[in-house]
């Protein structure tokens, strides 16, 4: 079911005309191509500027974790970071020379067989004013979460982020333990994320909080897992299937009490749970400063938060929210199965929300396509408390 409605949140949503979108990482576009120029709340952002590769004090080519640690160290003076190849950045797979600021050990993996081996790193980009991180070839960053804090005039371009999800047993499917987001923006201004691809993650994909303003996310793809034979989710479910006794929630879903097949679990686990949280703390005074633009993005089987706004302003245009496969996966759970799952306190199913605005936040979604999203725009707070109502 495709929805093209004209009354959404506080303003309007209309059918996209002439929409084009990249399906994956793309080469950096030639300068002067107006279709790819910066627009939205991050207007005027120049990142690290135009710097010659020969200026090795401010232009760093990164081939490994140690190179990246040196380039992103606070007060490094680096302005442009070019990622030259795929980087595996889990805490257990980077050398000791890289196990220092800005790298830190993230929360331990508990269930995914790969992440239990590689570990997960947290990379903090702190105090930069003018920084570009990009790849000319669409390099992939795996097993790491990046936090940009107290920074301004930052560009992140043409990168792919992958392998940061695992099955959640510890909070019974609520995914409230590991706090792994690919990118978190904190107390920053002027951040442009462009031509990137974000695969399934444990928590959010790109979150913005602590009053971060002037954010634009453009020409990017956000997607769940496709459930193929060697996909990230399939590898996780294979581990659970082989060790059911160690995973009570999974074992229950597969038991006769519920009756889901292994393939059912893979399909239902595939869609990404959350997109963009904008404002992490309810009623925080800094939330009024939040501002974000989303344009020319594909959200493929994202269940929620496109975006989820607590105060401030968000503008989304020329985006596609396509939840067709997620809707199909949800149909695998019968009402009797849902009752059985809930009776044990487990959370396993598909949410279907689009844009959410509360706490006097305003979202404008226009010139976009929404397909098979049950609640294209909603408010998840108590309407009786006017502090939680959108503008």
From Swiss-Prot:
Catalytic activity: Eliminative cleavage of (1->4)-alpha-D-galacturonan to give oligosaccharides with 4-deoxy-alpha-D-galact-4-enuronosyl groups at their non-reducing ends; Eliminative cleavage of (1->4)-alpha-D-galacturonan methyl ester to give oligosaccharides with 4-deoxy-6-O-methyl-alpha-D-galact-4-enuronosyl groups at their non-reducing ends
Keywords: Calcium, Carbohydrate metabolism, Lyase, Metal-binding, Polysaccharide degradation, Secreted, Signal
Disulfides per UniProt: none
GO terms classed as biological process: pectin catabolic process
Protein name stated in the entry: Pectate lyase B
Assigned GO CC terms: extracellular region
Location of the active site: 305
Family indicated by similarity: Belongs to the polysaccharide lyase 1 family.
Predominant location: secreted
Temperature dependence, free-text field: Optimum temperature is 40 degrees Celsius.
Endpoints of the signal sequence: 1-30
Job description of the protein: Catalyzes the depolymerization of both polygalacturonate and pectins of various methyl esterification degree, with an endo mode of action. Shows the highest activity on 20 to 34% methylated pectin but retains 67%, 51%, 25%, and 1% of its maximum activity on polygalacturonate and 8.5%, 55 to 70%, and 90% methylated pectin, respectively.
Species this protein is from: Paenibacillus amylolyticus
Gene encoding the protein: pelB
Gene3D superfamilies, per the entry: Single-stranded right-handed beta-helix, Pectin lyase-like
Residues where Ca(2+) binds: 181, 203, 207
Gene Ontology MF: a single term: calcium ion binding
Stretches that traverse the bilayer: none
Subcellular locations according to the entry: Secreted
